[in-house]
Amino acid sequence: MNRCLVRNPMRTRSWLNGSLQACLGTNSPTAACRQKHSLQAPVARPSDVEYCRLLVQKNDYDNYLVSLFSPKHTREAVWGIRAMNVELVRAGETTTNDMAARMRYSYWRDTVNSLYTSSPVQTPISRVVHDAVQRFGISRTWLRRLVSERQNALEQKTFATSADVESYGERAYACLVHPHLEALGVRDMHADNAARAIGVAMAVMAFIRSLPLLLAQGRCDLPRDLVAKHKVDLEDLFDHPRLTPELQDAVYDFATKGYTRLCGVAEIYLPSSPSTALPALLAAVPVQEWLERLERANFDPFDKILQRRSLRVLWRLWAASRRGTWLQKSNYH
């Protein structure tokens, strides 16, 4: 049976109205924390910036493309923080045991603390991020949370509910959008809420995208409530990773949650945000494009089309930057 992602604007608005009060809380670090910009001389070398740029281009290509639509003076900050995220992801994926991963996360916590001193840890990434902190007043909260949430996810192993994944996305993945907003000089409640919702969609995409690899390793990142709801037989999938009708239903359900958030951002938060926030919020475009490819693959995460880079992302980023939104009339039916 062919399925379509939910694009009904009334359903999107209903979800947003229902959760608006929670999203507009006063506990936003961006609203509460204001860093004073330092006049310290930059410590990063041109080779440090190039190292970060190449690391992001190789390991996070879609978001590298997003960075190219940001004002030139902000790109180094974006590359530095994205490069830091690449290393944090590697810390969880490449270490052979949890203790080794904890040691690497401890190193990154110390590194983050050093970024707010005059003597940052001397690595290319830390020097570039240090300069971003000093130049743009990047909140310490986002960088600390980036480290802590990656470690928490490693130790938690699985998520009990879809709501847990959404909360994780708001905390972990949105921490990559918030600093970009700060580098753009945007301190705005609506833009912050947009970043949270984009973070949810990013987490949904990442969890679905990793399914083929994780199932082959005897793991599954789908929240347990969806697995139970759709009666997914994980033991069978661990032995023979493949698409089953039950897995397809669960993936469809999960993907729709992420896609609804993106439509909600474009419909509600983006029009209320400063126009200067758009370069950071364009992080939604690659996620939307991937989820729509998943839809064309009939929600089969094993489809090879999902593992390849899409040439459409660059064009859609350009179009969204020109129109001021990533929604098209065809997004609703």
What are the functions of these language-model segments?
Residues 151-183:
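Internal, conserved structured core segments that host functional sites
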